[in-house]
A protein has these predicted regions:
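Exported/extracytosolic protein signature
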Residues: 1-220
Length: 220
């Protein structure tokens, strides 16, 4: 049974935080049926297993190796196997991602050289959708007191964000008091408050608290 395998990523470029899908196409060029087929695929370092499915295939994953089996394959093509792996939002591994799969059976194969096929998938630049909400808690401020704002930043993904910066101009007539937030480095210069952090994973960041003073003589 002359088996062959073709692995295809559909020309994808994967962005950290997303999944990468492979199609594994197995065929038997004969002349005999193949028995006890097994397709193996080692997940590349840094990636995670999501799923492996295919009609008539029994698939599973253990210790980073995906295995799909079927008892027999007549001459012709088998239903394709769809393998999905996850690329973490903070992926910093090999680029491109190299991955190969191999098919074998208990039936002698006269040309085993086409039983393995690989793909090289480029990793694109990360993409991070940042959002910010500014809230004064519904406060009414009295001249001579302070006004406090909460700045809530969220990374909607799919990738981690790097070199994150939040800026907030001090309103005319008000004074800067403080700006604090866990993991943030904050300061004020020339009437602009700036808070920075090196990275932000997908999800919310600790809130920033910005305090301005409203002078007793305020008439703005």
């Amino acid at each position: 049974a002359d088996l062959n395998l073709v692995k295809d990523d559909a020309g994808a470029t994967v962005v950290p935080g997303n999944n990468l899908t492979y199609t594994l196409a197995v065929a038997n060029a004969g002349p005999s049926d193949a028995a006890a087929l097994s397709v193996t695929d080692t997940i590349p370092a840094g990636l995670g297993f999501v799923s492996a499915t295919g009609a008539g295939w029994a698939c599973g994953q253990a210790a980073g190796v995906v295995t799909c089996t079927r008892p027999t394959l007549a001459v012709g093509a088998a239903p394709a196997i769809t393998l999905v792996v996850s690329v973490p939002a903070n992926y910093a591994g090999a680029n491109p991602i190299l991955n190969s799969a191999t098919v074998g059976s208990s039936t002698a194969d006269p040309t085993p050289g086409d039983n393995t096929d690989g793909e090289s998938t480029p990793v694109g630049a990360g993409s991070a959708d940042l959002a910010i909400v500014k809230d004064d808690g519904g406060a009414s401020v009295v001249p001579g007191n302070n006004v406090t704002y909460a700045l809530d930043v969220t990374n909607l993904g799919p990738s981690d964000a790097s070199t994150v910066s939040v800026t907030d101009a001090v309103p005319a007539g008000l004074g800067f008091v403080s700006a604090t937030g866990a993991g943030w480095t904050c300061g004020e210069a020339a009437g602009v408050v700036t808070c920075t952090r090196a990275t932000l994973a997908v999800g919310p960041a600790p809130s920033i608290s910005v305090v301005f003073s409203v002078p007793a003589s305020y008439t703005g």
